[in-house]
Design a protein with these regions (language model features):
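N-terminal secretory targeting modules
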Residues: 1-57, 61-66, 74-76, 107-115, ...
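Conserved beta-strand scaffold positions in the cores of enzyme catalytic domains, especially
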Residues: 54, 81-83, 151, 189-194
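Active-site segments of SGNH/GDSL-like serine hydrolases
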Residues: 120-124, 145-174, 196-199
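Short glycine-rich catalytic loops that host catalytic nucleophiles or stabilize transition states
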Residues: 84-86, 195-200
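Conserved SGNH/GDSL esterase-like catalytic core that processes O-acyl groups on lipids
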Residues: 47, 51-56, 61-137, 172-175, ...
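Substrate-gating cap/lid alpha-helix
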Residues: 159-196, 210, 219-222
Length: 227
């Protein structure tokens, strides 16, 4: 089985409230998943090798479009990207189809022949005020599946002043979800990228423009090569 070396986090959803001893959990609803008895390797460098297979999970930031960061990523790295991102999704919900969530997509995917995994997200679960504890359980289930792999978590900037996008959320929920992502990634030895740390031009106030996609691509590659 090939070793996966990367993942980028996304908030995509499905109501997962079941207990799991595999997750080191003491609580069915999630907030006590805090036992850190993992022993995973430190970060490893991303090698720019052509024909490496990368699978991408996430929401509309990565979903197929006329232009996305993925197009540039393939051109610059020579990697083969398998895109499994779904629009309007989150870890514990999807407004139109509850089976199409990032969590379920990750858990159902065969990663045996994949070299790297990238997961995006952060906006949808926050936007719809999903319960942080449930998102934490769902995300940790994803982490557990790829626990021997490397993860880079991208938490997109939340934009509270947009009329049509991220308006329906409160700061406390956003902070809890972000902290849970950081904590889970730290527990599993994954790397975090916070997209709010660099300026991404947006075509509609939320989704990256052509220029924004290039910036995102470059920042992802840069982050992968840092360690």
């Amino acid at each position: 089985m090939k070793k996966l070396t990367l993942l980028i986090l996304s908030v995509i959803s499905i109501s997962l409230i079941s207990c799991s001893t595999d997750l080191q959990t003491n609580s069915c609803n999630g907030y006590q998943i805090r036992e850190k008895n993992f022993n995973y390797p430190h970060k490893i460098r991303f090698k720019m090798q052509r024909n490496k297979k990368i699978i991408v999970f996430g929401d509309s930031i990565s979903a197929p479009s006329d232009f996305s960061w993925i197009n540039q990523f393939e051109k610059k790295t020579g990697c083969i990207v398998i895109n499994k991102a779904v629009n309007a999704t989150g870890y514990t919900f999807r407004p139109y189809n509850y089976t199409e969530t990032t969590t379920k997509t990750i858990l159902d995917s065969d990663l045996e022949d994949i070299d790297y995994v990238i997961v995006f997200g952060g906006i949808n679960d926050i936007q719809f005020n999903r319960i942080p504890e449930n998102i934490d359980v769902a995300f940790r289930r994803c982490c557990h599946k790829i626990r021997t792999k490397k993860v880079i978590s991208i938490i997109p900037l939340i934009i509270p002043d947009q009329d049509n996008y991220s308006t329906n959320f409160d700061a406390k929920t956003a902070l809890q979800i972000r902290q849970n992502f950081y904590k889970a990634s730290d527990d599993y030895g994954f790397t975090i990228i916070n997209a709010a740390m660099f300026d991404i031009e947006r075509s509609d106030g939320l989704h990256p423009s052509v220029s924004g996609g290039k910036t995102l691509c470059n920042e992802i590659i840069r982050a992968l090569q840092e360690k």
